């Protein structure tokens, strides 16, 4: 499994996890150009992103969520307007993305759905 922190800080956050041909982008708070540049430096491209998870609705985490098809996006309630309810993440309710088991946790943070 590969785990790459692409950006961290108040100007943008993004992490990329890749394992057995499946890529998950956690947060997309950086510009698309910057995202593609950073992925490219690691030997990946946009097509390697199979799923996008948003941790919460702050701009430094979701700035460029609109570049992704909502069918691959998963987030807490209220983070993406109009997202299918089957893609809403609920704290402590695990779900599968390919061979990954995701267990969302609830934390204290000033956000709609942290």
Where on the chain are the PLM-derived regions?
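Short acidic-hydrophobic, aromatic-tinged amphipathic segments that line or gate anion-handling sites
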Residues: 87-91
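Catalytic core of the metallo-beta-lactamase
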Residues: 94-114
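Short loop/helix-cap segments at secondary-structure boundaries that form the rim of catalytic
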Residues: 65-68, 80-86, 96-97
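Active-site environment of divalent metal-dependent phosphoester hydrolases
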Residues: 11, 57-62, 80-82, 110-112
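Divalent metal-coordination and catalytic microenvironments
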Residues: 17, 27, 56, 102, ...
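Conserved beta-strand hairpin/beta-sheet module of binuclear metal-dependent hydrolase folds
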Residues: 1-40, 114
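Short, flexible loop segments at the rims of nucleotide/cofactor-binding pockets, characterized by
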Residues: 2-5, 29-31, 50-54, 104-107
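Active-site metal-binding motif and surrounding structural segment of the metallo-beta-lactamase
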Residues: 33-78
């Amino acid at each position: 499994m590969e785990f790459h922190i692409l950006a961290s800080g108040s100007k943008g956050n993004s992490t990329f996890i890749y394992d057995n041909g499946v890529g998950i982008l956690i947060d997309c708070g950086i510009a698309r150009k910057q995202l593609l540049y950073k992925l490219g430096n690691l030997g990946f491209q946009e097509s390697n992103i199979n799923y996008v998870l948003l941790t919460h609705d702050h701009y430094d985490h979701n700035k460029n969520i609109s570049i992704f098809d909502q069918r691959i996006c998963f987030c807490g309630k209220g983070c993406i307007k109009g997202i299918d309810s089957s893609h809403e993440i609920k704290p402590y309710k695990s779900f599968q993305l390919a061979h990954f088991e995701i267990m969302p946790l609830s934390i204290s943070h000033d956000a709609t759905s942290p």
